[in-house]
From Swiss-Prot:
One of its GO terms (biological process) is tRNA 5'-leader removal. Keywords: Cytoplasm, Endonuclease, Hydrolase, Metal-binding, Nuclease, tRNA processing, Zinc. Consists of a catalytic RNA component and at least 4-5 protein subunits. The gene is rnp4. HAMAP family: RNase_P_4. It is found in: Cytoplasm. It catalyses: Endonucleolytic cleavage of RNA, removing 5'-extranucleotides from tRNA precursor. This is Ribonuclease P protein component 4. Its EC number is 3.1.26.5. It comes from the Archaea. GO terms for cellular component: cytoplasm; ribonuclease P complex. GO terms for molecular function: ribonuclease P activity; zinc ion binding.
């Protein structure tokens, strides 16, 4: 093995450790939030700094659980309001009740499911059946 391979392996290991740490910090934030929201917010800040330092992507399930503006851990019904909207496109609106920041996430699950169903049925030779 050359130096590049060793360095690449080390980088991969560092990123794996960083991913584990981010996951651990967010699960800790989730567990500790009912007792100490400030500590949960601190865990989120640490997780964000680890993620930025290691240059890894934040998993989607955690990306939507903190406010992008004030970096507080969001719990629907406690410090976040979650609403579903259809116009101009179907999306989820999450409002941080600490700072008032609004985040919008599109949801296209039904269309993707229909597309998958249509592609599977055309492979079988049946064609799309939208009657059911």
């Amino acid at each position: 093995m050359g130096k590049k391979d060793i360095r690449r392996k080390e980088q991969r290991e560092k990123k794996r450790i960083a991913r584990e740490r981010v996951e651990t910090l967010f699960t800790l934030a989730e567990r500790v939030f009912p007792y100490s929201p400030e500590l949960a917010n601190r865990y989120v800040e640490i997780a964000l700094s680890v993620q930025q330092k290691a240059k890894i992507r934040m998993p989607r399930k955690w990306k939507r659980r903190y406010c992008k503006k004030c970096h507080s851990f969001l719990v629907p019904g406690v410090n976040a309001r979650v609403r579903l909207r259809d116009k101009p496109y179907p999306h989820v609106v999450i409002t941080c009740l600490n700072c008032g920041n609004i985040m919008r996430y599109p949801y296209l699950r039904e269309k993707k499911a229909r597309r998958k169903y249509a592609s599977k049925s055309t492979e079988n030779g049946n064609g799309p059946d939208w009657t059911s």
